[in-house]
């Protein structure tokens, strides 16, 4: 074989049709993996051998699934061959619920590899049975039933990107103090000092997602002064958190009921952190629980 590239990183992407393997391979390509989709298992070992001889290839990701037809059962033999040759690899297995997969196939109008549209559910269940043993060998199992493409990308970035900025994520939650503090927060920010839309009859039943409320909160001189200082603080802190090996910063932003001010500030902070290049997930814990007064 010649000089081997012993540092070659090998990812095998597999799982259920419609679970997001194409999106996964695109994400991995974005972070530097040499990607091959629908590689026949019989060619897999030879491809890895050639990649190990190439100085230009450091990371490979291979999508192998039931589209390989009669060749797919060969995958177990190839994995054994890799292990016998002491070649390390990781398996990423993507799946989703039957209901979600049926919906995705109907929306895309694509044919399932194992059957026609008239027996779609049967085809999905048959594929699930075929992949059960391989699923048990997975190093990273991802259920995409409730994941957006962006959230799937964030999961893969956090695990496989060598860029520390990409591996770091901020989780921002808005909440109402009347309903208790989030228990898993690193930073808790009290924004009850900001102007309160609740006391304007037009905005009382609105939320921080409504344009009128957003403008009311963000156009305040107090808010502008606060957000400038708060974002500067985060800009200062986050690089130090990354340096210490922290991969997630949980930020909780609270107002009285979690309906107006905290929602606006959580969304605004999330957008600003994204502009800085960080992965951000924003959720609003109490936005639907605003029956009590702020």
From Swiss-Prot:
Gene Ontology molecular function terms on file: ATP binding; GTP binding
Binding residues for ATP: 15-22
Swiss-Prot/TrEMBL keywords: ATP-binding, GTP-binding, Nucleotide-binding
Source organism superkingdom: Bacteria
Residue runs in coiled coils: none
Function of the protein: Displays ATPase and GTPase activities.
Record PANTHER family: RNASE ADAPTER PROTEIN RAPZ
Similarity remark: Belongs to the RapZ-like family.
Protein name per its UniProtKB record: Nucleotide-binding protein Swol_0262
Lineage of the organism: Bacteria, Bacillati, Bacillota, Clostridia, Eubacteriales
């Amino acid at each position: 074989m010649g000089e081997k590239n012993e540092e070659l990183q090998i990812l095998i992407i597999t799982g259920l049709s419609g679970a997001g393997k194409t999106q996964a391979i695109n994400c991995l390509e974005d972070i530097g993996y040499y990607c091959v989709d629908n590689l026949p298992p019989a060619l897999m070992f030879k491809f890895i051998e050639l990649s190990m001889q190439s100085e230009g290839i450091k990371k490979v990701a291979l999508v192998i699934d039931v589209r390989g037809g009669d060749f797919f059962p060969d995958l177990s033999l190839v994995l054994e061959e890799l292990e016998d040759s002491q070649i390390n690899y990781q398996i990423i297995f993507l799946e989703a619920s039957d209901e979600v997969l049926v919906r995705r196939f109907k929306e895309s109008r694509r044919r399932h590899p194992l059957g026609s549209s008239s027996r779609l559910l049967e085809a999905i269940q048959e594929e699930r049975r075929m992949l059960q043993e391989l699923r048990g060998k997975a190093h990273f199992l991802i259920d995409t039933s409730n994941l957006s493409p962006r959230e799937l990308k964030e999961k893969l970035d956090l695990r496989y990107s060598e860029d520390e900025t990409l591996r770091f994520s901020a989780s921002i939650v808005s909440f109402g103090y009347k309903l208790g503090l989030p228990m898993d927060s690193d930073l808790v920010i009290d924004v009850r000092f900001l102007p309160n839309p609740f006391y304007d009859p037009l905005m009382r039943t609105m939320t921080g997602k409504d344009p009128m409320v957003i403008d009311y909160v963000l156009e305040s001189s107090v808010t502008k002064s606060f957000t400038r200082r708060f974002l500067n603080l985060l800009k200062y802190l986050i690089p130090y958190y990354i340096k210490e090996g922290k991969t997630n910063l949980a930020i909780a932003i609270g107002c009285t009921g979690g309906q107006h001010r905290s929602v606006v500030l959580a969304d605004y902070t999330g957008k600003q952190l994204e502009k800085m290049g960080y992965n951000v997930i924003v959720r609003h814990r109490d936005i639907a629980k605003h029956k009590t007064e702020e």
